[in-house]
Amino acid sequence: YVKQMNLLIHEWDLPSVNLLGAIDDGKGVWATGYQNGTDIYHPNTDGHREFTYAMVPSLFDAIDAGKGQPSRVSGTSYVLADKKVLVFTPEDMVHPFTLSFKIKGTTDGVIASFANGSNATGTLKIQDGVVVYHSPLTGEIKGAVSVTDNQWHVVSLTHYYAQGRTLLYTDKALAGELGEKLTVGKFTIGDNTSANSREYSELFFYRSAMNQEEIDKLCDGRMLKSSLEIYAPLDGSKSTIENLAQSMNSVVLK
């Protein structure tokens, strides 16, 4: 019921925060070290702090500016080629997060990367036709779904900071997970070292992790809005990259 309630709140037509993805352990209880002593109903100070990281920092500025609730946009895309990339930096400190986007192409190569700490980079690559996550710390997660068939595929990387877990999904299929705690900075979509062409659509960045049920709904085309900082439909016919999420953050083409 907790997961069902979380999904319901996602689709309410008002701003919301995905608290479940902040400090849940995946089974409806607090992650280890975040419970308030023997009080099973409340988190401790660190737990409340994790809640704040799941809030979009500029949400109220966006509301004050008249920015409304986003809706899903289908049928648009953006081709990245000749070393062009899309770049955004999350507002303020990030702990839990989910990065999700659609890709279509026929070649291997880097599809996204992010800064972690001061001098490490995490990458999402297509290797031998499948998506592979290379951790900025150690290890990798390798998918099993072929994504070089020139069809649309959804790639989702989700990180539970409190649990210390990163999970990779290709479409609705869980590729695997790593035990790690990330402190992410700038995100880059595409590969600024390659001239190869790849098509992208619907870029999402959430300030909260997502479970299997949420990933399924996202792949089904539902508009999940809780803790959403970036939603860029990506439309190559427009001169700028629009962010429809209720935040003041932006995505830049470089």
Model-assigned labels for residue ranges:
Residues 114-121, 170-174, 222-223:
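Short edge-strand/loop segments of extracellular domains
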Residues 98-105, 194-222, 229-238, 247:
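Extracellular, beta-strand-rich glycan-interacting domains
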Residues 1-70:
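Catalytic His-Asp segment of secreted/periplasmic serine-dependent ester chemistry enzymes
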